Amino acid sequence: MKLHELKPSEGSRKERNRVGRGTGSGNGKTSGRGHKGQKARSGGGVRLGFEGGQLPLFRRIPKRGFTNINRKEFAIVNLDVLNRFEDGTEVTPELLIETGIIRNEKSGIKILSDGNIEKKLTVKANKFSAAAKEAIEAAGGKTEVI
């Protein structure tokens, strides 16, 4: 086999359909858009969720809830992630950002108990779940709310 004999495998390359190039092509004149109407126009088509004038679903369903403007979002750190630190390390928010475990502090850091911890660490965070606090202390570490 030589370079000039190479050909793409059968059916792997499809020629694109050029519309509006004469009636003989099968896609001339109206270019597959039919005659007149909203969908035949440039930029034509109904908006997302439009149901032909019928009251749309999102307006038929009652409103629910509200957005709490004082909501605090915490950066979440699970216990299994803390195993990468050496025994006796003081884990602070600054250290977590520095090591790339979290990107930013948000409204603070919350330690959750997913996974298990084998290291003795002093963990400083804004919040701890009860199970996480228990697990850290069971491993011989300390928790400190900042």
UniProtKB/Swiss-Prot annotation:
Pfam families: Ribosomal_L27A. Residues 1-18 have a biased composition (Basic and acidic residues). GO terms for biological process: translation. Residues 21-31 have a biased composition (Gly residues). InterPro entries: Ribosomal_uL15, Ribosomal_uL15/eL18, Ribosomal_uL15/eL18_sf, Ribosomal_uL15_bac-type, Ribosomal_uL15_CS. Residues 1-50 are annotated as: Disordered. The keyword RNA-binding applies. The keyword rRNA-binding applies. Gene3D superfamilies: 3.100.10.10. Coiled coil: none annotated. GO terms for molecular function: rRNA binding; structural constituent of ribosome. Binds to the 23S rRNA. Belongs to the universal ribosomal protein uL15 family. This is Large ribosomal subunit protein uL15. It comes from Listeria innocua serovar 6a (strain ATCC BAA-680 / CLIP 11262).
